Amino acid sequence: MSIEINNISKYFGRTKVLNDITLDIPSGQMVALLGPSGSGKTTLLRIIAGLENQNAGRLSFHGTDVSRLHARDRRVGFVFQHYALFRHMTVFDNIAFGLTVLPRRERPNAAAIKQKVGQLLEMVQLGHLAERFPSQLSGGQKQRVALARALAVEPQILLLDEPFGALDAQVRKELRRWLRQLHEELKFTSVFVTHDQEEAMEVADRVVVVSQGNIEQVGTPDEVWREPATRFVLEFLGEVNRLSGEIRGSQLFIGAHHWPLDLAPMHQGSVDLFLRPWEMEVSTQSSDRCPLPVQVLEVSPRGHFWQLTVQPIGWHQDPISVVLPEGNIDAPVRGNRYYVGGLNARLYSGNQLLQPIALAQSA
């Protein structure tokens, strides 16, 4: 079941929280709405579910306008962050609840409900806990029950609002893998909200990055990671170093160092230069490739690489992060002096992207 969102806007009072959102979600895809708190991602999810109404725009499922359709008639399953299980019901009864309240003409008989719930319990690997109550379950088990309950009515679309946000890190990882496997088996269309970048990258087929009610970028996890479309996406996804520079003519200056640009840009003056830690080279000797001196402040071993916090010497005020692959040089220690450069620097004037530059040859 595909989802088509066309020019949707939403106000709360005089505050506009969604700005003319347009997005197509193909049938069978798992899509992450990723953004910081207050970005509008949960509001968009609730509009898809029918729990909120848009002020403008059209929402369609597989080409059929559902904008005025009540939530109960949309055949959408919804999983909340805090489970929303009925405390007085067993696991079995929680999962069966949606089936028991269907209109009489659509409601399965007791035997069919029992069979369906049994299948769902096995699917979420909780068959041995059918008679327990929510208070007797772990957080991960509760979330599996909530997911089984949402799937019981065979929804056309599954929506999840930060489904793993209340769980500890290890349980989150396990449930992410499990949900992805379940999606591969059932091929349902799914949209989930998260502010966890790792979660979005690991689980989703496509990632929709949202900020201040706007869609900043839509793409595969690899696309939004490697080719950020806007300055917001670049700064929001992962760790990035921001350096201050200045363009004079066709030269970029950082402290006492300067590099030639291919063309003299229209913009002259102050710019921001962005480099991700793993896009920087590190050397024990100054060279054309690594001309910028730094001193190591912190060393964090990460298995096959070292994460370094270094203080630029004479060319930038604040510490920056650098990734040093294991084996390139001797194990780093605090106080070591190195030289760094970069091969994929991105230049911005405000929110405008200027030409990329390699900090590999200092003029």
From Swiss-Prot:
Subunit structure, as described in the record: The complex is composed of two ATP-binding proteins (CysA), two transmembrane proteins (CysT and CysW) and a solute-binding protein (CysP).
GO biological process, one term: sulfate transmembrane transport
Record: residues binding ATP: 35-42
GO cellular component terms given for this protein: ATP-binding cassette (ABC) transporter complex
Phylogenetic placement of the source organism: Bacteria, Pseudomonadati, Pseudomonadota, Gammaproteobacteria, Enterobacterales
GO molecular function terms noted in the UniProt entry: ABC-type sulfate transporter activity; ABC-type thiosulfate transporter activity; ATP binding; ATP hydrolysis activity
Entry EC no(s): 7.3.2.3
UniProt keyword Metal-binding, yes or no: no
Record localization: Cell inner membrane
Source organism superkingdom: Bacteria
Function according to Swiss-Prot or TrEMBL: Part of the ABC transporter complex CysAWTP involved in sulfate/thiosulfate import. Responsible for energy coupling to the transport system.
Protein name: Sulfate/thiosulfate import ATP-binding protein CysA
Catalytic reaction list: sulfate(out) + ATP + H2O = sulfate(in) + ADP + phosphate + H(+); thiosulfate(out) + ATP + H2O = thiosulfate(in) + ADP + phosphate + H(+)
Membrane topology: Peripheral membrane protein
Pfam families for the chain: ABC_tran (PF00005)
Key words of the record: ATP-binding, Cell inner membrane, Cell membrane, Membrane, Nucleotide-binding, Sulfate transport, Translocase, Transport
